[in-house]
């Protein structure tokens, strides 16, 4: 019903592969041309493999809302070795420490898709906000749930993620552009943007050393 009502508007859905019916759903959605991401999951290595084999091709904000290390192996260990997966990363230094992010980028940089996971306070000021019915406090640009202090989205913007990739993870400008633009377009199957070529959309931003 969602696919029919969406009429092509649904481009990606995140699914926890260990849930009942998840593998069948991944197969169905993939066959319908919808990108499926693995995320918000308590699964393990085997669950991630099953989801990927069923058609999942993206990992939602890697290292966040994911299972910890388990005897059976973690999802993170699968993600790092399976080249079929594009890997989202929130590069704000809070969701993933910059030193850890640097190691991830060095290991799988050509598969990294930078995302913001931004909430209403992005580009705004510290204070109290809501995400749905959840009360959130933003302090020093870090958004946390008032109920338990857990991270609640981010205030990161993509231009800052770009700068962080260069300054904190040591990547080249070309690599940062790929992680912010080319890789996301490739992951979503978008053909008309993501690189500078004849026939592509001319969505260009200018940066310099003071940006």
Residue map of PLM features:
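Active-site core of metal-dependent hydrolases
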Residues: 2-124
């Amino acid at each position: 019903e969602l696919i029919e009502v969406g009429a092509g508007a649904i481009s990606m859905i995140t699914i926890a592969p260990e849930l009942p019916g998840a593998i069948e759903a991944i197969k169905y959605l993939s066959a319908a041309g919808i990108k499926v991401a693995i995320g918000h999951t308590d699964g393990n290595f085997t669950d991630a493999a099953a989801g990927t084999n069923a058609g999942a091709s993206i990992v939602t904000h890697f290292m966040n809302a994911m299972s910890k290390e388990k005897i059976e192996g973690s999802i993170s260990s699968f993600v790092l070795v399976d080249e079929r997966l594009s890997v989202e990363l929130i590069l704000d230094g809070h969701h993933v420490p910059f030193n850890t992010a640097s190691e991830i980028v060095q290991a799988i940089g050509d598969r990294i898709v930078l995302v913001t996971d931004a909430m209403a306070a992005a580009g705004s000021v510290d204070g109290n906000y809501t995400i749905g019915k959840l009360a959130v406090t933003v302090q020093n640009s870090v958004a946390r749930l008032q109920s338990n202090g857990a991270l609640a989205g981010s205030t990161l913007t993509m231009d800052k993620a770009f700068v962080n990739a260069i300054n904190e993870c040591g990547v080249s400008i070309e690599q940062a552009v790929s992680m912010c633009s080319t890789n996301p377009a490739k992951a979503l199957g978008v053909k008309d943007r993501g690189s500078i070529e004849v026939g592509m959309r001319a969505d260009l931003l200018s940066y310099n050393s003071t940006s």
